[in-house]
Amino acid sequence: MLVKTFAAAVSGISATIITIEVSCTKGIQFFLVGLPDIAVRESHERIISALQVSGYKFPRSRIVINMAPADIRKEGSAYDLPLAIGVLAAAGDIDATLLDKYMLMGELSLDGNLQPIKGALPIAIKAREEGFKGFILPRKNAREAAVVDKLDVLGAENIKEVIDFFSGKGGLEPTIVNTREEFLAHQQHFDSDFSDVRGQENVKRALEVAAAGGHNMVMIGPPGSGKSMLAKRLPSILPPLSLLEALETTKIHSVAGKVGEQTSLLSQRPFRSPHHTISNVAMVGGGSFPQPGEVSLAHNGVLFLDELPEFNRSVLEVLRQPLEDRHINISRARFSVDYPAGFMLVASMNPCPCGFYNHPTRPCVCPPGSVQKYINRISGPLLDRIDIQIEITPVPFEKISEQRPSELSSVVRERVIKAREIQKKRYEAHKGIHCNAQMSSKDLHIYAIPDSEGLSLLKNAMQRLNLSARAYDRILKLSRTIADLDEAENIKSYHLAEAINYRNLDRESWGSA
């Protein structure tokens, strides 16, 4: 008897239908073809054990299983469930009538329980697109897949429940998730707030500008000055995710297996903070089983690199392409996958090896030339992609002990949202531009033209502060964002003056001591 079951293979953040054909005839051999990897081949032993524990026997027949299309490599253990159900149906142990209406995915334990899989959300989306009535998968993935409407998502605890379902004994109920309600319920909840931080008003303002214009940012300051504390509060002032952004972000985390059992849809912008020992592959993604890296897990959110110069030079260099293109393409001999990577880069660093260069009270003990050498660990092309470079100093005791309440993140967020709305309207006819940070040099001549007083100020600053040529475009982008926060149509001299203050590392005098 020949039967078909249906599964899926995930590539990038999309899925491809895999048709599993099972033929059961007289004989005693077992064949599995269609480019399966080792984990898929090993499913034979898992299926035998799971069926025995569940009260069924693996057929003593000649079984041939073909996984089509044969040119796509089938990887991982998530095919255990469709293979097992296909074998039972081909042997006549269960009714095959409903098999063409449901997609099946799940890894089997030896006791028959179903283990969670990766990529449940993109697979569910593909199942709906292909017209399947339902998707049967491990119960721990059910809420994640139930985000997809017009699809019955049936979460099963073990293979016995799935066998009973196809045998007409019931046992599986659709998982219902009110996507919009859950999305909105958790959107405004943050564990940390800008008001937690005493002082550092200039840095808070710089973070507000960064959030409003989507600008990358680096904070330079001594240990204990609050760099990490401030960076971790940045998501609390970013505009909320739209439903489409949340869906795309959740798909990436689903493929990486990072969506929790009780989570249906990520409702807050991700904040990723990898350790400085991270490898190239962990940063951008890849591996023998392609997985999204930190740049993709931070998509629509923030990638925070603490102690930037301590990262391996090659790791920092691989950031250049996703920062420019907002996606990352991973090409290997066997595959090529594409992951979204539209993130805000926020970094922190000490000003020198000892950490106390320009400190108001503690002397720097670094030898001559070491400060510039330390800064030079970050390449010019990478620094060129960081709009805001601000120095941060320790908070004096008077500020720390101050009882006056600081401004809440919710208040700052409202200003940021208004600025983003202005930019959305400005660039609605421009494909690929959503915020000021994405403007090209050509766009600057249209949307970021300072008045004559501002031009004079900018020229004077370039000469007196020895600002580099690459700072010019960045200053104009920042001044455009600052003007948007003021809800001003034209860029004024005071907008430019503030923007110039955010370009510390461009000054030739920096690190010359």
Question: What are the roles of these predicted feature ranges?
Answer:
Residues 1-218, 225, 331, 471-472, ...:
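Peripheral, non-AAA+ core regions of ATP-driven protein-machinery
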Residues 300, 306-307, 318:
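Walker B catalytic acidic pair
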Residues 219-260, 325:
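Walker A/P-loop
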Residues 39-44, 59, 66-76, 289-290, ...:
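Basic, amphipathic alpha-helical bundle interface domains used for macromolecular binding and assembly
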Residues 221, 285, 307:
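The Walker A (P-loop) glycine that initiates the GxxxxGKT/S ATP-binding motif of P-loop NTPases
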Residues 170-209, 213, 240-295:
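P-loop NTPase nucleotide-binding/switch module
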Residues 110, 303-304, 310-311:
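Residues immediately C-terminal
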